[in-house]
Amino acid sequence: MWGLVQDGSITKIINKPRGMVIGDVRYSRKIFELWSKAELEAKGIYEVVFDNSNKKDEQWYINTNQSFAFAGGKITASNGSATPKKHADTLWTSQDKTDGKIPDGKDVGDVAVEGLKTKLIRTVKQQAAGILQDTDWYITRKADAGTAVPSSITTHRAAVRTKAAEQETAITNAADTPALETLYTYVNTAEEGDPPVMERPLGELPRLES
């Protein structure tokens, strides 16, 4: 990506090589392949440098659009401050009702927009159900034929439910969006010099050993 600078201001952002007119002269797209950095800059064409220091994980934050600035002989593309996504549900209010914004079937206090916590807890429930589904046949067989469920399976299923409940509690108790992000962020918990062990505070749902 490049930018065209004229009289000290960026007048055009060039996303890919293309022909262009600068002043009264038309230049081929080939200049982006054949000309040196200095030759391009002599015509006011500068390669864009990306500053991602303000850009955050879009699972947790809403990033701003990039803005472009020319200073010190270079064009920099950067983001403004990211906004954390709402961790709690947004509810319909009395004012919403007065303004006629609440849809049919909903009322004051109902969820208008789900927050991250609701979505994450739903995912935990789905993941736990998916793991338990692998051993559901033991339960079906017991109901149909009276065959006892192995104790290892019973223990595993209980462990899945227990861990899922712990995860849901941790999510519920998170104070804000950065706290939720921390729960899901993997860090190396190994001692220095040992092979890396990547773990997250939220932990993992148990898997049945083969």
Model-inferred region functions:
Residues 150-158, 181:
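Short, charged, amphipathic alpha-helical segments
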Residues 117, 145-149:
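Residue-level recognition of alpha-helical structural elements
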Residues 1-133, 165-210:
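Interaction-interface detector
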